Each structure stands twice: as C-alpha cells, then as structure tokens.
C-alpha cells in the first residue's frame, strides 16, 4: 500500500470518491500463487496464477463481500480499507533491507469475517530479518522476476547471456550478477548501462565471463580478485533513483550506483597470465614417437601437449628425453614455458626470448 502498485491506485481512487475498498486476504494459498503476486505484468493476477499452476484456479466469494479468493486457501480474512485514507501511524517494522523502517501513515483495515479449514495450517513469512535476510521468502520470490527481467533486457541489447543471478542476501534485488559470452570490447559496460537504465532497484551490478559460475561464491570471489582493477573496471552513476528504504542513502531516494566489470580483457585472453590454471585433459591421437620429433614439427609445446602428442600416461619418458636434449645444448623454452629446439649451452635450458624478465625477481 505504500509502494506504487495497482492496489494503491485502486484504493486512492476509492478514497477520492468516499468509498470503502473491500479486500480479502488468502492465508496459506498454493505456494506458487505468491510468485504471481510478486509479478508486474499487464494481466489479471488470477489468470497468471492459473497459468503457473497449469490449471484453472477454483474461486469462491467471501461471505461478507463479493471479492473472490482461491477456494483451496487455508484461511481467509475478509474486510475493507476505510475511506479515510492514510491516517493511522503504523510501525516501525523490520523492512526488506534488514533494518527497521520509519513509522508511516497507513490505511485502517476493518475485519468483517475470518473463515478457515478445520485442520487449518497458518502460513507466515519471514520479513525484515536483519543479517539473515537471505532466508526471507520475499527475497527468493522477487529474484525470479528480476532475473527474468534482466535476461530479457540484455538479450534485447544483443548481449549473449550465460546466466543471471540475484543473490538472496542483496536486500530484494539490489545486487545482480551476470555472466556473458563476451564477443566484443566494451560489452560488459554496455550490459551495465542497459540494466541500470531499466531496473531502478539495482544498486550494484557485476559482470563476469561465461567460465565463472555466478552462483558459486568461491568462483565469483576469485573472478573479483583476479580480473578487476578499480580505476579501470568500475563505473559509477551519481544521482540515480534507488530503493527508498536503503539506509545508506542520506538525501532521499537518490544515490550512487556502481557497475563492476569482472571480465577478462578480450585483447589479453591468449596471455599466459590470463589462462586459468586447470588440470589438462590428455586426450587425442598419438602423433610422434619421440620428444625430438614433436618439437621439430610442432614447437613450441607445453609439457602437457608433449604428453598428448606422445600418448604418455605419466610423463616420465618425456622428462628423460627433455633432459637428454638439455645435455646436448638443444633445449629451449619461450617466455610462456613452452619447449622448442634451438641452440643453448650444453647442460642448460636456453631462453628463446632474451628480453624476458622474471616478474618475481
């Protein structure tokens, strides 16, 4: 009733005409009904409930008004909001950000009847749960809608989306993580701009590559620490509208939002220090009998590539052959650690790039 909604619009219209607004509360309805209640689409909610349930919703009228409710609800509280408007001081309550919100004026609801099943199950919701906000039902219900909305926005902006995720601890959708198939320079920044331009509730947006599982806290943290530079990869927007209950905002509902580009720079993807250290998959046809043959034909090669080329199971024979080439002064390595044939002092491995500098020295 305090946020912009159809219900608020209908009620303020009743007040302007001096009319009461009959309302029935269904307690303990089908769990998927709450999903429909949290959606904002230009259609009747009951129609959406039927669509999500996959069958028509049985409805019955209230006993003191004509408002229909799901017949399979556990309890129905009937009544009306009086015509006097927002007149009663209400609160404070724990709000969706996990902190207490200020007291505000609300309408008065008058109960006219309560009906329930004989074996009624009273359903309740966790709301305003402080540091345990991630357990609140509303967070998870809202995230489904926000994730779908964000995905549609990005697809309409020609951005190839791998996954979209609203973390449950982000106070009802103020944080959004997105993984994309990066295809051109600046795509992460374009995604951030498109999302902030269409979703006012977002406060921080994080964009990663498709190799990161954004639902895995460890992978997401790793991408943040290894691919992000604050002076290069953070975009901030001042004076943006946001969530009015955000306690960090001091001057009304306007504040600063930020986007974080946690993607690998396209122009550096082939660099060794941009290559994730993962266990190699040793599969493929055996192409050579000796290390010398492999390096004469296909150099430079990593050790794992030599194992694949020779069909080695553990690399022991490759180590022996590399040592023989080293003793003859024929073994070289490039700055990325790949092996090749060349001229070097006997008993030593030569460095193919004499300008290479050890970053650890």
Which residue stretches match the model-derived regions?
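Internal mixed beta-strand/loop scaffold within catalytic domains of large alpha/beta enzymes
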Residues: 1-26
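Charged, compositionally biased interaction regions
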Residues: 29-297, 302-311, 315, 319-323, ...
